Structure formats: structure tokens, C-alpha cells
Curated annotation (Swiss-Prot):
GO terms for biological process: DNA-templated transcription. Keywords: DNA-directed RNA polymerase, Nucleotidyltransferase, Transcription, Transferase. Pfam families: RNA_pol_A_bac, RNA_pol_A_CTD, RNA_pol_L. The keyword DNA-binding does not apply. SUPFAM superfamilies: C-terminal domain of RNA polymerase alpha subunit (SSF47789), Insert subdomain of RNA polymerase alpha subunit (SSF56553), RBP11-like subunits of RNA polymerase (SSF55257). Belongs to the RNA polymerase alpha chain family. It is an enzyme of class 2 (transferase). It catalyses: RNA(n) + a ribonucleoside 5'-triphosphate = RNA(n+1) + diphosphate. This is DNA-directed RNA polymerase subunit alpha. One of its GO terms (molecular function) is DNA binding. The keyword Transmembrane helix does not apply.
């Protein structure tokens, strides 16, 4: 029997299956028609943009001045080394730390891989990532700054955060490699109009997929929390511009001092309404209009119960039209 609902149904089932290492498939249902995508789409965006991870942000190599330099005994130039370094995914062993500076020394002949950069401070979750080939002449000394963050930050924004001598690196913080979803129909009490979210989440190993999901959900909840607070509705008090003929009168009616009047006149302000179209900042910027004149203008307007900068766009449009009519 059909019933008229007064509240939408909420999902009651969640199933999580492990697809492979650091990858899960999430099934959540049942959702009312149209609700599943309203949840899945922002969740995907948050997984990719707001899940915290780690990335190298600065590199210093002894004897190297910039990224277009080369290192004696290393087959790759510094630019190629940097590209390879971005593929190395670090994980700080102390989760409370936000950044660490790592010191390394390597000599050849040797091929460098991600696993060679693991130490007491960091774990490398991409141990097989290739970095460089050193020959017998190579003596490589370097420092790498690894930072915790979210999303993507270009090197231009990182440059000023680094100590002198470090090359800034583009930082890809997000540990989420894949976040895709499908919306499927699901039958609930013979009703085929309910929906199911099937969500695949894969990470690089810096965090596990379930932790990444929880981070994204926490971000979503925190963004929405403000709407659960007490909401105060304020009324916009208009200035009754339709019936206030004073708005369309010449400035003479304000009985301003000669200095104040002349400053406004030279600025092209002829009517009281034109004055009201200006903000306090715009008024202050008028040439030769000092603080004393500004105070006088505001005092004269206050006597008429008129406030600067309080008009809506519609009210401004009305004033402009009537002033143009008066001029013609």
C-alpha cells in the first residue's frame, strides 16, 4: 500500500569489501531516488581534494644551485631526478608531525629506489619507485623536506616556505589514487525506485581507504555543521527611496560648508542620491576631501536619517533612474 512520507528514508546498510591491497568497494543503500548522487558526488570531490597525505616539498643537493643543474656521477640530471622523486610516496612514522627534514648520502655504483630512502623518520610506501643511477664517481648528499598537506600545491607557493638553498617542488599531497562511484537501482519492499551507491576507493598506502573515507566524511560534516547552529534572520531596513524626494534634490539642500560642497561638485556629485550611491571608502578617496569634511557630510546625512553604503542594487538603480529624469 502506498504511503505519503513526511521524511525521506535514510540508508541502513553498508557493506565494505577488499578488492586488493589499499583498495575497497563500498555498498551503501537504500537511498531515496536522487539522494545517492547528492551524497556520492561531493564525497568523491572531498576524497580527492581534502584527504591529508605527505609529499616532498623541498630538495637540496650538495653542489647544486637549481633544478637545471647536473650531479657528477649521476646519469639523470636534477630535473629528471625531481620528476622521479615525486613518484616516491613517503609516510611519516610519527603521525603527529607535520613535516620532517631527511638527510641522505649515497655513493656509487648504485641504482636508487624508493626503499633506499626509508629510515627511522619515514616509511616509503612505493619502495620500487626508481630515482637515479649512480656510477663509481658519484657522491650524492641531499636533504629532502617532507610535508603533510591536502590537495595539490604548486612550487611557486612553496618557494617562500623553504630555507635558503632548497629547490621548491610541486606537491601532490592526496593519497587517494582512485575514487569512482556508480548509482544502482535497488529493490526495497517491492519498490524499485530506491538507489545504492557503489564506491571504489584506492589509496597509495599512506593511509588506508577506510581512513581516507572517514577523513572525507569528517570534512563534509564540518562544512555542514554551521547550518545546525541557531539561525538569526535579520531584516533589511530600506530607506524608503521611492517616497524620499530629498534623494533627488541638489546637494545645496544639505547646507554643507563651501570646502565640502566644492570637493563633491568637482567629483561630479550634484545630487544627494548620487552621494548615497557611494561607499565610505569611495567617499574618502575623493580628492582634497579631508576627515573634517567627511565627518561633516556624514553628520548632515545622519540628521536626515540617511546612511551611506546601505542601499540594495535595486534601490541604487531606482535612484539613478530618477536622477536622470531630473537632469533631463
Amino acid at each position: 500500500m502506498n504511503k505519503i512520507k513526511i521524511t525521506p528514508s535514510v540508508p541502513t546498510h553498508m557493506e565494505v569489501e577488499k578488492i586488493k591491497e589499499n583498495a575497497i568497494r563500498l555498498h551503501v543503500y537504500p537511498y531515496e531516488s536522487g539522494y545517492a548522487i547528492s551524497v556520492a558526488h561531493p564525497l568523491r570531490r572531498l576524497l580527492l581534494s581534502s584527504t591529508a597525505g605527505y609529499a616532498p616539498i623541498g630538495l637540496k643537493i650538495e653542489g647544486v644551485q637549481h633544478e637545471f643543474d647536473s650531479v657528477r656521477g649521476m646519469l639523470e640530471d636534477v630535473a629528471a631526478f625531481i620528476i622521479n622523486l615525486k613518484n616516491v610516496r613517503f609516510k611519516l612514522r610519527d603521525s603527529e608531525q607535520e613535516n620532517v627534514t631527511l638527510e641522505y648520502e649515497f655513493s656509487g655504483p648504485k641504482e636508487l629506489f624508493g626503499k633506499d630512502f626509508e629510515n627511522d623518520l619515514v616509511e616509503v610506501v612505493t619502495p620500487d619507485a626508481f630515482l637515479a643511477t649512480l656510477n663509481e664517481d658519484a657522491e650524492l648528499k641531499m636533504s629532502i623536506i617532507v610535508q603533510k598537506g591536502i590537495g595539490y600545491v604548486p612550487s611557486e607557493m612553496i618557494r617562500d616556505l623553504l630555507p635558503q638553498g632548497y629547490i621548491p617542488l610541486d606537491a601532490f599531497f592526496t593519497p587517494v589514487k582512485k575514487a569512482v562511484y556508480e548509482i544502482e537501482k535497488v529493490l526495497v519492499e517491492d519498490n524499485p525506485n530506491y538507489e545504492k551507491i557503489v564506491f571504489d576507493i584506492e589509496t597509495d598506502g599512506q593511509v588506508d581507504p577506510v581512513s581516507a573515507l572517514k577523513m572525507a566524511m569528517n570534512v563534509m560534516q564540518s562544512q555542514m555543521e554551521i547550518f545546525t547552529n541557531d539561525i538569526e534572520v535579520t531584516e533589511t531596513v530600506g530607506q524608503n527611496i521611492e517616497n524620499s524626494e530629498i534623494f533627488y534634490q541638489p546637494l545645496d539642500i544639505l547646507d554643507l560648508s563651501a570646502r565640502s560642497y566644492n570637493c563633491l561638485d568637482k567629483a561630479g556629485i550634484k545630487y544627494v542620491g548620487e552621494l548615497l550611491l557611494m561607499s565610505n571608502e569611495a567617499l574618502k578617496s575623493i580628492k582634497n576631501l579631508g576627515k573634517k569634511s567627511l565627518d561633516e557630510i556624514q553628520e548632515k546625512l545622519s540628521e536626515l536619517n540617511i546612511d551611506l553604503g546601505k542601499l540594495s542594487d535595486q534601490e541604487k538603480e531606482t535612484i539613478l533612474k530618477k536622477i536622470e529624469q531630473n537632469k533631463s
